[in-house]
Amino acid sequence: NTRLVGSEMCIRDRDGAGLANIKFDVSPGTRYISRFRSVKSQPIKNIFQHVNQRFENLYASDPAKLKDVDYLKANEAFTGELYLGHLRYGTFGKNSKENCHPFLRQNNWMTRNLVVAGNFNLTNVDELFDLLVNIGQHPKEVSDTITVIEKIGHFLDQENNRLFKEYNEKGYNNKEISSLIAKNMDIPSILKNASMDWDGGYTMAGLIGHGDAFVLRDPNGIRPAFWYEDDEVLVVTSERPVIQTAFNVKWENVNELKPGHALIVKKDFELKEVEINSPSNLQKCSFERIYFSRGTDKDIYKERLMLGSLVTPQVLEAVNFDLKRTVFSFIPNTAEMSYYGMIKATEDYLSGVKKKKIQELEQN
C-alpha cells in the first residue's frame, strides 16, 4: 500500500529536481524522512542514481537483504510509503539547490514535521512575509516557498497545540497524546487558515511527519492537478498523461482536483476531496496549457489544435496570403499540435480559394 502523493518527476529536466519520502511506524531513533535535491545538468537522473546506489551497494554486499522489507525500512533511505517529487522551473528566487523543492520543516515531534513542494506563483510574497514577521517569526529569507511552508507550519503548530491541550485536559499522557494528535489532526482547517491570504495560482503538495498528506489547488484553478487511486496507490500530478502512461489507465479514470479543494490523505489511506476556499471564476493558466503541459493530454491536444486554427487568419495576413513563398514550421516542440491546427486551417482556406475559382469559371 505505497502512496504516491504529488509525484511531479517528468522526463524534462529544468532548473533542478527533488524527492522526499516518509516511512510509517518506525521505532524512535530511526530516521523516517529522506530527501535529496539536485541542480546537476540532468537532475532527475542524478536523483535516481543517488537513490539506487544504496541498493546497488546492498546487492553487492548482501543480496538477500534486498528482499527483507523490515531490514530495508529500518536501515535504508527512500524505503517508506509516502513520496513527494518535484521538478523546478524557477520563476522566483535563485536557481540553487536550496531553492529546489521539496522543502522540509523539521521538529522532534512527528506531527510537526512538514514537507512541501508546489507548482505556484504567488503575487503577494512581500505581504505574506510581513504577516509572518508580525506574528513574531524571523524568516531566514524572502522567498515564495519559505513563506508558504512557514505559513502552513504556523497553523500546523497551532493545531498541534490545540489538540495537545484538549487531550491533556482529558488526562492522557504525552505519548498517548502524540498518537491522538496524529489520528485527529484537522488538516482542512490548517489549509484554510494558511491559504487565506494567498493570491495567485498554486497547487501545493505536503506531507506531515506521521503520514498524512494533502494537495491543495487555488480557487481559480490556475494551476492544474490530477489524481488517480486504485487498490495499491494514490498518485497526484500536475499533468494527466503522466498518470495514464505510468499506470496504464484511461483518460476517464483520472480525476481533476476541483479548484479551491484539497485532496486529504490520512495515514490509514482514508481519502477525501474537501472544499478549502470557495471556487471562483475558472482561469486556467494559458502558459501551462499552451506551452508547458504535455500535448498528449486529450484536452490540451484539442486546445492546441484550436489555437493553431485561430491564429491562422493573422498568419495569412502577415504573409499577404502569398502561400507559394511561405514555409510553415513550429518552435518549440510543444507547438507541434498548434502547427497541425494551423496547417488544417490553411488547407481549409486553400479549399475555399479553389472553390471560389471553380465557381468563377462556371459563371464564365
Show the residue positions of the predicted features.
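Short, glycine/charge-rich flexible loops or terminal/linker lids adjacent to PRPP-binding catalytic cores
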Residues: 344-364
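C-terminal substrate/ligand-recognition segments
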Residues: 335
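Conserved short alpha-helical segments that host acidic/polar catalytic motifs at enzyme active sites
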Residues: 1-3, 7-258, 264-327, 331-332, ...
